[in-house]
């Protein structure tokens, strides 16, 4: 009797363990399913986040990556500060002090050559070794890469202007005309050096600030784009469609052909 009782107890214990084990596994599977659902929902939420100008890559990749992007995003503060300081000093020298570029280059070359010439001759009198002047060569590959990149961007710009001039996209036409008009106003107020310095300062400040406050800027950008689309829809309905409707259909068919 005792053995039968123990046997029954062991059977009951095994049954209870199986029930608990099944419950634990089911709870684990439920938790895994919950994690998967939350991760999928979070990933879908992230994919729905609005990015300025339809950007899908990080700011570092948008700027081209590598060392130039590191400089613009202040990854190395000493290098970025040195470049911005040199550009600022050049602008102050040429713009505020009204020093001309050709005169500056000539005076700098005169000073450097005279200093090296006197130093080399002085070393012979005091019986010291002459200063080592390193050989400077411009490498070919970076120049070719720069020219190739400029060629690609210029061709893209020419293709865009050609498509706009063909009359296929009214929206791009209006945006380009407005942009050129704004640039003409800015260019009439400032010279090329000031514009270059302003663009450099903006390039060293806007990307790093945007990277820091990316979510807030994208939220405001989304609201602004919605408002712009609303205003463009009103303009398209009240003005553009009326203008296009007044154009003879024969002229439109010729443009399409």
Swiss-Prot record:
Residues that span the membrane, as ranges = 78-98, 99-119, 173-193
Q: What would be one Gene Ontology cellular-component term for the protein?
A: endoplasmic reticulum tubular network
Record flagged with keyword Transmembrane helix: yes
> Topology relative to the membrane, per the entry?
Multi-pass membrane protein
Checking InterPro entries in the record gives:
Reticulon (IPR003388), Reticulon-like (IPR045064)
**What positions does the domain Reticulon occupy?**
68-257
Annotated localization: Endoplasmic reticulum membrane
A Pfam family the protein falls into: Reticulon
Q: Which UniProt keywords apply?
A: Endoplasmic reticulum, Membrane, Transmembrane, Transmembrane helix
Q: Where does the UniProt entry say this protein principally localizes?
A: endoplasmic reticulum
Using the UniProt annotation, give all residue ranges assigned to the region (Disordered). Answer: 19-42
Top-level division of the source organism's lineage: Eukaryota
Q: Which GO terms describe its biological process?
A: endoplasmic reticulum tubular network organization; response to bacterium
KW Membrane (keyword) present: yes
| Physiological role | Plays a role in the Agrobacterium-mediated plant transformation via its interaction with VirB2, the major component of the T-pilus.
Outline the subunit composition: Interacts with VirB2.
State what protein this is by name.
Reticulon-like protein B4
Question: From which organism does this entry originate?
Answer: Arabidopsis thaliana
């Amino acid at each position: 009797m005792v053995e039968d009782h123990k046997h029954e107890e062991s059977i009951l214990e095994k049954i209870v363990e199986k029930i608990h084990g099944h419950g634990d596994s089911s709870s684990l599977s439920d938790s895994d399913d919950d994690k998967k659902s939350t991760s999928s929902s979070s990933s879908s939420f992230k994919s729905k986040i609005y990015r300025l100008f339809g950007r899908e890559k990080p700011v570092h990749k948008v700027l081209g990556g590598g060392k130039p992007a590191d400089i613009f995003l202040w990854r190395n503060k000493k290098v970025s500060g040195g470049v911005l300081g040199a550009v600022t000093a050049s602008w102050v020298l040429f713009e505020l002090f009204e020093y001309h570029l050709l005169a500056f280059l000539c005076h700098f070359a005169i000073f450097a050559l005279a200093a090296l010439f006197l130093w080399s001759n002085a070393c012979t009198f005091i019986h010291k070794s002459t200063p080592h002047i390193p050989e400077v060569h411009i490498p070919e590959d970076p120049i070719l890469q720069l020219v190739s990149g400029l060629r690609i961007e210029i061709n893209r710009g020419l293709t865009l202007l050609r498509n706009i001039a063909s009359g296929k996209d009214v929206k791009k036409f209006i945006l380009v005309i407005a942009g050129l008009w704004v640039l003409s106003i800015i260019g009439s107020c400032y010279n090329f050096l000031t514009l270059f310095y302003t663009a450099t300062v903006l390039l060293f400040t806007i990307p790093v600030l945007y990277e820091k406050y990316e979510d807030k800027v994208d939220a405001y950008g989304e609201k602004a784009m919605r408002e712009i689309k609303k205003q463009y829809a009103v303009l398209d309905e009240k003005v553009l469609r009326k203008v296009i409707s007044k154009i003879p259909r024969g002229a439109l068919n010729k443009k399409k052909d």
